Amino acid sequence: RDSVVNAARAVSVQVQSAIIQFSSNFQMALNPQITKTYAADDYKMMHKLIGRSSKFTFFFLLFLSLPIMIQTDFVLTIWLKTVPDYTVTFLRIMLCTTIVDSVANPLMVAASATGRVRLYQSVVGGILLAILPVSYIILETGGDPNSVFIVHLIFSVIAFAVRLFIIRPMIKLDLSEYMIILGRIFMVVCLSLPLPLLYHYYRDCLLYTSPSPR
């Protein structure tokens, strides 16, 4: 079982790394501007850049990841022929985690720009380090390998929220404005998922119910 899980994780990490590379290149243009506007005390423009970076990164990654997440079996079968167990679920959860971390990245850049990162790194780093013992406990108590990646996703969301509240006073961020951006992101998710999921479900129903050729 361990070898199957390791193979599944290796495949998932390969795909995740490619997606992360795309998002890093996309954000690279805005990151120096976030630092520059903080140095110039132009908080208003800095907040706009953080919002734009979070929003556009999310849209870009959703555009790349959604087809893969919906058609994971199909994509992996074409690529690998024989897909290791757990790979489909691992990859889907890891892509969700990647999107959360990428949306949070502008906040990390803003924290670095202030130079006051001790509290930020201690708290956020502590949250992320907790993934390891929590995952170990879950596995020791009979948890499924998928649970490790679910734990990672949950802790990434928690770390995102904590980042936001720690950084908010450091850069004078209007929390309500940023929450509006997150609300729009959530709305896009709600609007973009139903049709692809319905199509995927309908196609699978046709495949499983169609009579086999004689």
Feature-to-residue mapping (PLM):
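Interfacial/gating helices of multi-pass transporter permease domains
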Residues: R1-S17, D85-T89
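Membrane-interface junctions at transmembrane-helix termini in multi-pass inner-membrane proteins
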Residues: L95-L128, G142, I171
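Helix-loop junctions and terminal segments of transmembrane helices
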Residues: S12, Q16-S54, M108-A113
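Short alpha-helical transmembrane segments in multi-pass integral membrane proteins
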Residues: L49, S53-M69, V124-L128, N146-R168
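Alpha-helical transmembrane segments of multi-pass membrane transport and lipid-handling proteins
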Residues: S23, H47-S102, L132-E140, C190, ...
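Conserved small/polar residues in nucleotide/adenosyl-binding loops
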Residues: Y208-P213
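Alpha-helical transmembrane segments of multi-pass membrane transporters
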Residues: L119-P145, F155-I166, R184-Y201
